[in-house]
Amino acid sequence: MKGATNLFKSMRKPTNVGNFRQFSVNQVNSDNKRSEPGKKTHFGFTDVDEAEKEQKVHHVFANVAKKYDLMNDAMSMGVHRLWKDYYVGGLQVPYNAKCLDMAGGTGDIAFRILRHSPTAKVTVSDINQPMLDVGKKRAEKERDIQPSRAEWVCANAEQMPFESNTYDLFTMSFGIRNCTHPEKVVREAFRVLKPGGQLAILEFSEVNSALKPIYDAYSFNVIPVLGEILASDRASYQYLVESIRKFPNQDEFARIIREEGFSNVRYENLTFGVCSIHKGMKPRK
């Protein structure tokens, strides 16, 4: 185990399940008017209208929700658990903190935060109701976590239905690349955080060039096949692989975070850049 831990470190660089609120996707779309008619964006490697992308992404995660955690284990050979443990272990969570975990549907990050910080409360938010349903069912089995410490909210990350200056910590794990406008998500995170609040985003990123041929071969030839075998859905996992390649690289995403007002912006690569942890702070007034 010690050897495995050292290897991981060497691969990184500098029944009631709580409250539940729902904001329909249509209502959020109407209120936000984020997508401009006819304006193009990408859905994987395919160009689509912005509004169409949102619906396609929603369809992907509705399809994979029940097999989502199983597929994460299969695709990463369990390494995603190490990434998430390390990510949460490095969070600075104040006493009695209010945390917002966006795109947190199945609860993977929220449950870790609640164990890591016994006084914290977490709002788990996701645009996809089936993902939240899976998370709430998981919460029923988490006997060491008080249901009142978790709130489940169906909402869109590009216009969050939360008051400004509310949260001490904003987390988002493997979700922001699926958003049509990542910069708007970061902007909303800045808004809902208290002054001095922390942003921490875990996302797939640009892998080290030496590993790229092997990584690409595995991603394009193995992951879609696993999706077909384990989840009966090859297309959704083909999109997953493609979406990673379309997301900004580490430096570009750090620039977005900085431009939206965050200070002390930095990132840390895990597993040769397969994923990265991005952090920033909302300046104190």
From Swiss-Prot:
Q: Which GO terms describe its cellular component?
A: extrinsic component of mitochondrial inner membrane
Q: Where does S-adenosyl-L-methionine bind?
A: T106, D126, N156, A157, S173
This entry's Enzyme Commission designation comes to 2.1.1.201
Cystine pairs: none
**Key word Zinc present:** no
Q: Where is the transit peptide?
A: 1-30
Keywords assigned: Membrane, Methyltransferase, Mitochondrion, Mitochondrion inner membrane, S-adenosyl-L-methionine, Transferase, Transit peptide, Ubiquinone biosynthesis
**Class in the EC hierarchy, top level:** transferase
Does Mitochondrion show up as a keyword for this record? Answer: yes
**Top-level lineage group:** Eukaryota
Any idea where this protein resides?
A: Mitochondrion inner membrane
Give a GO biological-process term.
Answer: methylation
State the pathway, as annotated in the record.
Cofactor biosynthesis; ubiquinone biosynthesis
Task: Please give the SUPFAM superfamilies that the UniProt record associates with this protein.
Answer: S-adenosyl-L-methionine-dependent methyltransferases
Membrane topology listed for this record? Peripheral membrane protein
Q: Which HAMAP family does this entry report, sorted A to Z?
A: MenG_UbiE_methyltr
Which family, according to the similarity comment? Belongs to the class I-like SAM-binding methyltransferase superfamily. MenG/UbiE family.
What is the protein's known function? Methyltransferase required for the conversion of 2-polyprenyl-6-methoxy-1,4-benzoquinol (DDMQH2) to 2-polyprenyl-3-methyl-6-methoxy-1,4-benzoquinol (DMQH2).
Which NCBIfam families is this protein grouped with?
Answer: MenG_MenH_UbiE, PRK00216.1-5
State the oligomer form and interacting partners: Component of a multi-subunit COQ enzyme complex.
Q: What is this protein called?
A: 2-methoxy-6-polyprenyl-1,4-benzoquinol methylase, mitochondrial
Species the sequence originates in: Caenorhabditis elegans
Which gene name does the record give?
Answer: coq-5
